[in-house]
Regions:
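Beta-strand-rich domains and repeat architectures in extracellular enzymes and scaffolds
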Residues: 45-73, 536-541
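Short loop/turn segments that connect beta-strands within beta-propeller blades
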Residues: 78-82, 119-124, 162-168, 204-209, ...
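Beta-rich, blade/repeat-based domains predominating
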Residues: 47-63, 91-110, 132-146, 151, ...
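Blade-level signature of beta-propeller repeat domains, shared across WD40, Kelch, NHL, RCC1
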Residues: 517-549
Length: 549
């Protein structure tokens, strides 16, 4: 063999060995090692104002006011720049709808508290005009005489006249009308608004509750306002349409196609129509003279809660939407939006190769979705405040209920068969499947607990945590937990030792009166490289933290 041939064979052998080693490396993936430290959190999806935006009103000073139910706050929005600030903080500021009187009076509905609050002006004290009326939703003043009317929707179905002096109890105007949402009192003293469950807009006489149908061509009408020109402007949350209905003949004309999940509207003195969108934390300004729409403010997410990672994407239970986020670019894709789909306010999400599960403690539901078609396979009601779920390979689904402290396995036709896997969990919030086949559950009482799925036995991994919520396992076996009462993420090893990953985080949205302490669970996910993602319920962002080695 000559020298040149030797060099040739040496090079060939080297290339072959290199290829073999490369192949072995790709076939035998070595999990990343535990990092020395972590990067600072970086924004993957940008923050936004509100926590879902609902009621709108223009007050006597020309201010655009916007209400948030989940955020328990009433906001002021700059009509030129779109910048927003909290005007009445939580919890008193919770507002599903806002009404402005003929002077400076302001009233708003505390939907989840079943109350109506009122103040005569900015410097006057707040007082409660009504309470113990679940689902107080919409309200408005009769500007001729100062009378105030309010409606119950979803958690009740009635219309009331409220005494602004607080001396008299509420007077029942009508009940079981069909969900009298976002209404307005006309100059004639009649109540004009939509019947959510009947697809109608109607006129109601507050003296006797008599209902007159104006138009029946809507799918899910959410709110209506008069323009003073003989028209009733109506939004349909299911279709996203902004329509004009002529009071004289009931003729409906679709004026603008907006996004679905629109919730309320307000008409300014200059004729501009402002429309809120709960799924986007958005407010649009529509000019009826030109047909132009200007987005005043919006966000990519509404109220991000439960979070799961799969195949390069994050799946987000966004309460008013279900969304997918590209884990690299942060691009957001809508998978479902409230009212335009069969989804019911998702707070938790689970994922497997073939299925996605959504849970809502608010509606007591488990929704099972075919991942290939993104169509609902089964919707199961009747759970006792389900916080999280995991679809299993055998077809069953694991569900945790915060109201019972149970970890359930549901299976069979319609997932009607329930088996208690473990009981006595002290406020189970979120869970993750461990690499050892056990389930790891955060408990609001301050624990990270391992549950053996075979016998239901529980082992405390860590105690003394400050309202732990989201949890995910790293490739090297530890667990990342969101300690929301401390506003930090911690890494917990199997022996219970922990270290802080990041602190002073915008997490831990406080629960209002009567709500479960976790309220909106901070979601945590970890990808195969050990990158951490978490949802921030205080500013509606998603952050990414990268391991430093």
């Amino acid at each position: 063999m000559n020298q040149s041939m030797g060099k040739f064979f040496s090079a060939a052998i080297g290339a072959t060995v290199g290829a073999v080693l490369l192949g072995l490396a790709s076939c035998t993936s070595i999990p990343p090692s535990k990092p020395v430290s972590w990067s600072k959190p970086e924004v993957l999806v940008a923050p936004s104002s509100f926590s879902g935006v609902h009621g709108l009103a223009i007050d006597q000073k020309g201010r655009l006011l916007a209400g948030s139910v989940v955020g328990y706050e009433l906001w002021e929005v700059n009509r030129t720049t779109g910048s927003a600030r909290v005007m009445i903080p939580a919890p008193e500021g919770q507002a599903d709808d806002i009404a402005v009187g003929s002077k400076e009076e302001l009233a708003w509905t505390n939907y989840l508290m079943g109350m109506v609050r009122y103040r005569e002006n900015d410097s006057a004290p707040m007082k409660v005009l009504a309470k113990d009326l679940p689902g107080l939703n919409s309200l408005d003043f009769d500007r001729r005489n100062g009378k105030l009317y309010a409606s119950q929707v979803f958690l009740g179905d009635a219309i009331w006249e409220l005494d602004v002096s607080g001396a008299k109890p509420p007077r029942l105007v009508a009940k079981d009308v069909g969900g009298f949402n976002g209404f307005e009192v006309g100059p004639d003293g009649m109540l004009y608004g939509p019947l959510w469950f009947k697809g109608q807009v109607v006129k109601i006489d507050p003296s006797n509750g008599a209902v007159t149908v104006i138009n029946s061509q809507f799918q899910t009408p959410a709110a209506a306002n008069l323009d003073g020109k003989g028209n009733l402007w109506v939004i349909d949350t299911k279709t996203g349409e902004l329509s004009k209905v002529e009071l004289a003949n009931g003729r409906k004309t679709v004026m603008k196609q907006l996004k679905t999940a629109i919730d309320n509207l307000a008409i300014a003195p200059d004729g501009t129509i402002y429309v809120s969108n709960m799924a986007d934390n958005g407010i649009d300004a529509y000019n009826p003279a030109t047909g132009e729409v200007r987005n005043l403010t919006s966000g990519k997410l509404a109220v991000p809660a439960g979070l799961r990672y799969a195949d390069g994407s994050l799946y987000v239970a966004d309460i008013f939407a279900f969304r997918k986020v590209d884990a690299n670019s942060g691009a957001v894709t809508d998978l479902a939006r409230m009212q335009a789909s069969d989804m019911e306010y998702p707070f938790g999400v689970g994922i497997s190769k073939s299925r996605i599960t959504l849970t809502s403690w608010f509606t007591g539901t488990l929704q099972v979705i075919d991942r290939a078609t993104m169509k609902t396979d089964t919707m199961v009601h009747g759970f006792k405040a389900p916080m999280d779920s995991i679809p299993m390979d055998d077809g069953s689904v694991l569900v945790i209920e915060i109201a019972t402290g149970n970890l359930l396995r549901v299976s069979g036709a319609g997932f009607k068969e329930q088996k208690v896997v473990a009981a006595g969990l002290a406020g189970p919030v979120q869970m993750t499947m461990g690499s050892d086949g056990a389930v790891y559950v955060t408990e609001a009482a301050g624990k990270l607990t391992r549950v053996n799925l075979t016998d239901g036995s529980k082992t405390a991994i860590a105690e003394g945590l400050l309202l732990p919520e989201g949890v995910a396992q790293t490739p090297w076996g530890s667990f990342i937990v969101a300690e929301t009462a401390a506003k930090r993420l911690v890494e917990i090893d199997a022996n219970g030792s922990k270290r802080t990953i990041a602190e002073n985080l915008p997490i831990g949205l406080p629960a209002g009166p009567g709500m479960p302490p976790p309220f909106v669970a901070t979601g945590v996910a970890v990808d195969p490289k050990g990158v951490i993602y978490f949802s921030a319920d205080r500013n509606n962002a998603i952050y990414r933290i990268t391991p430093q080695r």
